């Protein structure tokens, strides 16, 4: 039977988003690029097979799942494995299959602790276990996809992203019948590609920022609701929440704003 893990609080033991992806990819020989791609449930099923061989019907897992009902089917397999091994954790399937960062990141943080508590270090061939099936990244639709200038796809698919590298309709001179490619076109295309990748990185960082800000806001509300209890622990939490960097001065709301940068 499995060792149950109940702690879900954010601690220094939690891996960052990038470290978590690296651990998953290395352990299962996958190529995930986003936490949201865990919404298919396939990776969790294979981790359960690694921890407790035979606990899940791995043949029923759709490693190439692309549709929500296929994700749900995978999580049903995972739920059956949890029940078989006595895992008490309730899987928020309805939230996970939506492919949102916050829900999937919270669940994988718990799962990593669960894995560490149960893994005995035995060797495991993930590719052979899934019979060589290649996984397919879920077709996630980000909430900012309506921005006209946002590049499509993920950072890993950058080389296949169509980029118009400032192709100018120059007329051939000297009767050669050929349009010479400007020397700076390759460099421009490379710079545009770097910009696109950086935009995606910024978007991911903003999601992560909003995720942790939401947690801090919830903590603040709890402290405010119990403000009259004079609990020293709550008071200490409030002090930490409102602490500022050394030398930081809160600006006077009535003072005119000066020295703003001009662009």
Curated annotation (Swiss-Prot):
Cell division keyword on record: yes
Gene Ontology BP terms: attachment of mitotic spindle microtubules to kinetochore; cell division; establishment of mitotic spindle orientation; negative regulation of microtubule polymerization; protein localization to astral microtubule; protein localization to microtubule
InterPro entries: CH_dom (IPR001715), CH_dom_sf (IPR036872), EB1_C (IPR004953), EB1_C_sf (IPR036133), MAPRE (IPR027328)
Subcellular location: Cytoplasm, Cytoskeleton; Cytoplasm, Cytoskeleton, Microtubule organizing center, Centrosome; Golgi apparatus; Cytoplasm, Cytoskeleton, Spindle
Sections of the chain in a coiled coil: none
Highest taxon, organism lineage: Eukaryota
Entry-linked PROSITE patterns: CH, EB1_C
Residues of the Calponin-homology (CH) domain: 14-116
GO MF annotation terms: microtubule plus-end binding
Similarity field: Belongs to the MAPRE family.
Protein name as catalogued: Microtubule-associated protein RP/EB family member 1
Organism: Coturnix coturnix
Species classification: Eukaryota, Metazoa, Chordata, Craniata, Vertebrata
């Amino acid at each position: 039977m499995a060792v149950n893990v109940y702690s879900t609080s954010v601690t220094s033991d939690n891996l960052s988003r990038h470290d978590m992806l690296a651990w998953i990819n290395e352990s299962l020989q996958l190529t995930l690029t986003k936490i949201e791609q865990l919404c298919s449930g396939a990776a969790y099923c294979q981790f359960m097979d690694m921890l407790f061989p035979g606990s899940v019907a791995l043949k029923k897992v759709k490693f190439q799942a692309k549709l929500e009902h296929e994700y749900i089917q995978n999580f049903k397999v995972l739920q059956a494995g949890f029940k078989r091994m006595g895992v008490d954790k309730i899987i928020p399937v309805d939230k996970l299959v939506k492919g949102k960062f916050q829900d999937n990141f919270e669940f994988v943080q718990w799962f990593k602790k669960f894995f560490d508590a149960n893994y005995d270090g035995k060797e495991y061939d993930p590719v052979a276990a899934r019979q060589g099936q290649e996984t397919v990244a879920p077709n996630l639709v980000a909430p900012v996809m309506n921005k006209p200038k946002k590049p499509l796809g993920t950072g890993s698919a950058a080389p296949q992203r169509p980029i118009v590298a400032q192709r100018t309709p120059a007329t051939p001179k000297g009767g050669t019948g050929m349009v010479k490619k400007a020397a700076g076109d390759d460099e421009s295309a490379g710079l545009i590609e770097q910009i696109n990748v950086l935009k995606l990185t910024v978007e991911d960082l903003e999601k992560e920022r909003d995720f942790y800000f939401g947690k801090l806001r919830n903590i603040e509300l709890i402290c405010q609701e119990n403000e009259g209890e004079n609990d020293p622990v709550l008071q200490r939490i409030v002090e930490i929440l409102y602490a500022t960097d050394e030398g930081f001065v809160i600006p006077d709301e009535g003072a005119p704003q000066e020295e703003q940068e001009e662009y």
